[in-house]
Amino acid sequence: MANDPRNFPQRKLLVTCALPYANGSIHLGHMLEHIQADIWVRYQRLRGNIVNFICADDAHGTPIMLKAQQMGMSPEEMIAAVSIEHQKDFAGFDISFDNYHSTHSDENRELASHIYLQLKKNGFISSRTISQLFDPEKEMFLPDRFVKGTCPKCKSEDQYGDNCDACGETYSPTELINPKSAVSGATPVMKDSEHFFFDLPQFESMLKEWTRSGSLQTETANKMQEWFESGLQQWDISRDAPYFGFEIPGEKDKFFYVWLDAPIGYMGSFKNLCDKRDDLDFDEYWNKDSKTELYHFIGKDIVYFHSLFWPAMLDGSGFRKPNNVFVHGYVTVNGAKMSKSKGTFVKASTYLEHLDPECLRYYYAAKLNSRIDDLDLNLEDFTQRVNADVVNKIVNLASRNAGFIAKRFEGKLAENFVEPELYNEFVAAADRIAELYEAREFGRAIREITALADKANQYVDEKAPWVVAKQEGKDQELQEICSVGINLFRVLMTYLKPVMPALAARTEAFLNEELTWEGVAQPLTAHEITAFKALFNRIDPKNIEAMIEASKEDAAAEMAAKEKAEASNAAQETELSKDPIAEEIEFDDFAKVDLRIAKIVSCESVPKADKLLKFQLDIGGEMRQVFSGIKAAYNPEDLVGKYTVVVANLKPRKMKFGMSEGMILAAGPGGKDLWILEPHEGAQPGMRVM
């Protein structure tokens, strides 16, 4: 067995998944990446390598701040609840993280500040005043993701303000065509603000060398070359208050842009792990001259940040760069984008309520490769492939032989192994399967394994132990045939252990033997196994249908909760909250104001005045002329004969159109939304308002 791990030096690896954003649930799109990374990590551990597998919630930014407000809680409360939910989902899919943390942590604050200050010290940070989009209704600067419009590069509509999902380009939100605030829908206005920039162009030579190292995926390297040719730009790393995140050291009301401290979250999570253990050294893994290996698994939508900004930030602040960034595509369901209305936008928790997580792990593995290809979760194919491969070909191999071993031979395998050539063929496949796992060609590895399963079942079919069992004097032959079948099953499950850890654990209990990569070199002989129990259940199409219906219900409940929160927030935004009560005054101050009932004798528009109406008011034996800016709210003729309230002792004011001898009282924010005060029936002109 040439690829025996005992023949190679032990590797030390730090592996990460992209940090899920802490404002929503994990769904099957997220799970592609986490399953892909977990399979690779489990394979490395199976080969005897030391792996630290870490992740965290990406917990900063305006979206989190606004959603927390919508939910009526603090951002800290919301991200704490989301973290619990995320970790439960990942555990449900057997994602074997060594540590799961949050970017909103002391470790991350310290590391983000340290990296920023080092970059500043080394001359890679500058500041300048920029014109930035500002929401005039919400009175806030708009983060990139809260401006939507048409991409300036490819002209795709409904794109975010920082990068285009259609063409992958990044740009400034001010470059968007027809921008709109995603918060209020208002057209943003430009407003000046001082911002801080990371000088990415200074790292172009280093990044080109890193790209040419040959370790990056071809598609990633080609995309980076396009970015080099179009020219690297300085990167805006700051955001203005209000913002949920870390304040920039030494600056007031300036915060780190979420994409600065998010990847530093990899370091923060590992630092948190190091602080909890005494066998890990943070510097050993992150020093510039580190001999350990660092790998990031990410989706294709965040390549720009991980292949340009992140290695440049690390290099500029004295840390090591990643060995590689493994990029995957998106998940579609039944050939289309995941849809909430169709029930194909499936949350991880909803899946776990209806189906075995190992089914999805196997199916994703069977379709994954090392390229940046989208993966389609075809639910019909999903059912057929899992049932055919896992149940019919692999698990059935054990059930076809285990019964005879248990009933006829007290659970003991044969002392002699009678098919060494066949077994050696299975063992020889280990090197090829190992290469495919290492290269993340999981689909090809699965095809190698299922091809071996076909050979194992062919052997059992040809030997027909159910026929031999009925023949006199054939007990030894029966035991030997079934022992071969059990041993071939053992090899197959060893190869599948990174993909299906729970099934592998049940197999180990059945075989009474740990499955190890080097262990397959020799078959089990004269070995006692336990009584066979069902190891794996078929997928029932009814469960998939139930999952789809539950996903539709999830979407409806989510929409109802959102509408309820919005209604609650709208109710909370009272007139009083929008226009707070003025400072207290003494009673004597109020007593100076003489309010009287007035009858509107006449009312007419003022020529060449957009807002004014001219009133003649009877205030009880005395006529007053008053001008009032309520023209947008009333037709003059509709007011004649009505009673209202007027400030009678207001000093007369000379206006362009005449003398105004008082003030009519009206309520409202202005414009069309104004209502004059009217007394109840019985009030007479000249009466004092007490």
UniProtKB/Swiss-Prot annotation:
Sequence motif 'KMSKS' region, residues: 337-341
Catalytic activity: tRNA(Met) + L-methionine + ATP = L-methionyl-tRNA(Met) + AMP + diphosphate
Cofactor note: Binds 1 zinc ion per subunit.
Gene Ontology biological process terms from the UniProt entry: methionyl-tRNA aminoacylation
CDD domains with a match to the protein in the record: Anticodon_Ia_Met, MetRS_core, tRNA_bind_EcMetRS_like
Span(s) of short sequence motif 'HIGH' region: 20-30
GO cellular component: cytosol
Matches recorded under Pfam families: Anticodon_3, tRNA-synt_1g, tRNA_bind
Membrane-spanning segments: none
Residue ranges annotated for the tRNA-binding domain, each copy included: 589-690
Cofactor(s), by name: Zn(2+)
Keywords: Aminoacyl-tRNA synthetase, ATP-binding, Cytoplasm, Ligase, Metal-binding, Nucleotide-binding, Protein biosynthesis, RNA-binding, tRNA-binding, Zinc
Top-level division of the source organism's lineage: Bacteria
Residue positions binding ATP: 340
Protein localization: Cytoplasm
Name of this protein: Methionine--tRNA ligase
Gene coding for it: metG
